[in-house]
Swiss-Prot record:
Protein name, UniProt field: Glutaredoxin-C1
Location of the Glutaredoxin domain: 19-119
Function: Has a glutathione-disulfide oxidoreductase activity in the presence of NADPH and glutathione reductase. Reduces low molecular weight disulfides and proteins.
Disulfide bonds listed in the record: C39-C42
Family classification: Belongs to the glutaredoxin family. CPYC subfamily.
Length: 125
């Protein structure tokens, strides 16, 4: 199944449509990871989120008919051209290094908890 857009480059209007689609996806889930199945950095981020007990939505761009367009739209929107591209509660976090650094600083779990991706068990301690 081919792309809905002709050629390799999207028009400004086509880009706007795909950016809006990406924004709708990001706003629909507490945590979104734009990924590719063969990407080791993507695997690290997904593994970390799983180990932390987070619920998250993964979009494997290499398995989507419009994955290339979505990645281009993410680049246009966030300035980040690579995957993984992670969003928490609608906010752009970044790629693997940024997610790992945020976790190392002790800031990732609170972000995930605030987003509702991890159950807040602090009242049960």
């Amino acid at each position: 199944m081919g792309s809905m857009f002709s050629g390799n480059r999207m028009s400004k209007e086509e880009m706007e449509v795909v950016v809006n689609k990406a924004k709708e996806i990001v706003s629909a889930y507490p945590v979104v990871v734009f990924s590719k199945t063969y990407c080791g950095y993507c695997q690290r981020v997904k593994q970390l989120l799983t180990q932390l007990g987070a619920t998250f939505k993964v979009l494997e761009l290499d398995e989507m008919s419009d994955g290339g367009e979505i990645q281009s739209a993410l680049s246009e929107w966030t300035g980040q051209t690579t995957v993984p591209n992670v969003f928490i509660k609608g906010n752009h976090i970044g790629g693997c290094d940024r997610v790992m650094e945020t976790n190392k600083q002790g800031k990732l779990v609170p972000l995930l908890t605030e987003a509702g991706a991890i159950a807040d068990n602090s009242s049960q301690l």
